[in-house]
Amino acid sequence: MFTRKIQKTALAMLISGAMAGTAYAAPEVLADFHGEMGGCDSCHVSDKGGVTNDNLTHENGQCVSCHGDLKELAAAAPKDKVSPHKSHLIGEIACTSCHKGHEKSVAYCDACHSFGFDMPFGGKWERKFVPVDADKAAQDKAIAAGVKETTDVVIIGSGGAGLAAAVSARDAGAKVILLEKEPIPGGNTKLAAGGMNAAETKPQAKLGIEDKKQIMIDDTMKGGRNINDPELVKVLANNSSDSIDWLTSMGADMTDVGRMGGASVNRSHRPTGGAGVGAHVAQVLWDNAVKRGTDIRLNSRVVRILEDASGKVTGVLVKGEYTGYYVIKADAVVIAAGGFAKNNERVSKYDPKLKGFKATNHPGATGDGLDVALQAGAATRDLEYIQAHPTYSPAGGVMITEAVRGNGAIVVNREGNRFMNEITTRDKASAAILQQKGESAYLVFDDSIRKSLKAIEGYVHLNIVKEGKTIEELAKQIDVPAAELAKTVTAYNGFVKSGKDAQFERPDLPRELVVAPFYALEIAPAVHHTMGGLVIDTKAEVKSEKTGKPITGLYAAGEVTGGVHGANRLGGNAISDIVTYGRIAGASAAKFAKDN
């Protein structure tokens, strides 16, 4: 094994040799470099015939022994620069998530961003979509080879729904294996920034906010154009406060309460100071899933759900990135693999006007969960309803949380004018922005809003926020008419004072924009959420397309399902959905496994 001293010496020799003009063929990948410096043993357990598991546990341990862990590397990074080791990602991020041994290393950050990191032995990010039924002959061979492992419950996906299901199933006494195809856990949940909608909660009561679960039901149905499954919506709202309590009991901070588009009342819960909710919730769930002994496997793609002759689920076929195909026998399977917003070919199939749009999602949101469920005969609904989030930053490659608007920001076009109610539903906001010149707009806010929402600091760090000491100076920064922007802000401040938006009937007017400096950032719609998916009941059981009855042993939760959000999801309802239905799916699956 390398010591850190030996590792540094080896790199120094490599660099000095190159600088001295020594005839030297530089290694192209990490395996070549380590092979020269210490042989395969420097990474692998040589007597085990290669890798020991798809998490590359041993290999990552070797990396840490030489280079230090992620916290050490983050601490050593320059404080004034974006560092790949200072991340919003959750879980125990492995070195091999980015640094590959036998192929070009690729910064996972580049799946969303364009930081241009100078990565050793690096290559360009690209992701090819491979159908789950590709290489069918090899899959059939693995199935014929028989069962490799047995468990009570298999969970597909490590986002909020999958992690909530894992915690819930473990608490119900089930043995759980959670499978994640990506090298990074957390799914879309780790990217969610706004909040978690819940009604009649303790944080609301403490802040004097009066809300009712029925109002949340009504808002959700109205936002979804009333095509939601009303029974699923009732479960969402009626269990929402309990889900807040459940998260809080495990260490989550959900004490800050704001408002998202389409809500009649402040009910969007998030950490103190308005920090991003998703990464926080995902980390809490991850920590608790690990604490409970959940077997979590990354780089592990489920390519088939297995059933017996009667149609009962019997397990899954997995393709490990390094270990290959193998079968896990399970009494129950929970699909929590998310939606397909990152698969534009599929998105544009259902909604052609979204062809070529960017997406706010993580790279794994390609629709695998739907594919394996369809193979198993599952029913689907509402697949044509796909949401574009109105505030995506083209410059930063990130979604700008709806909470910026909720806390008082306005949206202006290139003429410096407001053109909509900023906290309308996402579908209406996106449509309004696409009608403006350049099909984009600007969020404008002041320093009081910046100080009210910690999430904004991340956007500042990405250098996508423009700043001016005055509104007129800010207008020059974003190239809009200064007089018009000043007029717009003055008019809006008057609406705040009077308590009524005479232009666009914005229902919530939190604050005037008067505290310098002033800020703006460009926004445009991007594909964000796929409302349609698998048909489930209130127990999270997946229904059969053929019979309309539950498929025995198959459950689902989160964005992979349809019916909760109807034609349009309200901001803040996704986290509520994944936590509440993740809990239900995990408990239902565990109970079924125990009873059968």
Curated annotation (Swiss-Prot):
Residues 1-25 form the signal peptide. Heme c 1 binds at residues 40, 43-44, 101-102. The keyword DNA repair does not apply. One of its GO terms (cellular component) is periplasmic space. SUPFAM superfamilies: FAD/NAD(P)-binding domain, Multiheme cytochromes, Succinate dehydrogenase/fumarate reductase flavoprotein, catalytic domain. Succinate binds at residues 194, 389, 401-402, 528, 569, 572. Heme c 2 binds at residues 34, 63, 66-67, 225. FAD binds at residues 161, 180, 188-189, 193-195, 302, 368, 529, 559, 574-575. Binds 1 FAD per subunit. Binds 4 heme c groups covalently per monomer. One of its GO terms (molecular function) is metal ion binding. Pfam families: Cytochrom_c3_2, FAD_binding_2. It comes from the Bacteria. It is found in: Periplasm. The active site is at 426 (proton donor). In the C-terminal section; belongs to the FAD-dependent oxidoreductase 2 family. FRD/SDH subfamily. Flavocytochrome that catalyzes the reduction of fumarate to succinate. Is essential for fumarate respiration during anaerobic growth, acting as the terminal reductase. Receives electrons from the membrane-bound tetraheme c-type cytochrome CymA. Under ferric iron-reducing conditions, can be part of an electron transport chain to ferric iron, by accepting electrons from CymA and transfering them to the c-type cytochrome MtrA. Also plays an important role in the reduction of selenite to elemental selenium. May act as a transient electron storage protein. This is Fumarate reductase (cytochrome). The gene is fccA.
